[in-house]
Amino acid sequence: EYSSKTFISSKENIVRTHLFLILLIGFCYGQLFELNHDNDTRIYWVDYPDNATEPTPLVISMHGRNQSLLSHITYSQMSNFANPQNIAVVYPQGINSSGLLAWNTGVWWDNSEYDDVGYLNAIIDSVISNFAIDTNRIYACGMSNGGFMAYELACELSDRIVAFGSVAGNFMMNV
């Protein structure tokens, strides 16, 4: 039987678990960053190859709706492939829309006040200023709603991002 106290307690445990996992991942690889964009503080994770000796390609890898950067790092396994190839990966976090983390594109999005294209463009600028990135080899991909966002970036940031990929994300006609 659930009470409000049980719900709060379980919610606190979920938060503690996520914080523990973020710290654990931090000791393994990567770095968590905060970025203030449009008066919101948002986060993203960068996994930069340890042995890079020259500017590296950058992959922007976006989670699906109701996922997080942490869950995406875990299930995508992108860093396991990218790091040995001297490829940097950035995992941005979507914004909370109706209680779910999502990107402001696709059929479920109902709040146009967030500029995720601007946010992702600012992440690219930040990563370039903090790491040695080959600016001619920036890529974007995503799962589901993150794939929708990859298509959005293909239309909006094609001057910066050279290739795009989507897994289980449709190209939306309004893009």
Model segments located where?
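Sec-dependent N-terminal signal peptides
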Residues: 17-27
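Primarily recognizes the serine-hydrolase "nucleophile elbow" in alpha/beta-hydrolase
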Residues: 136-175
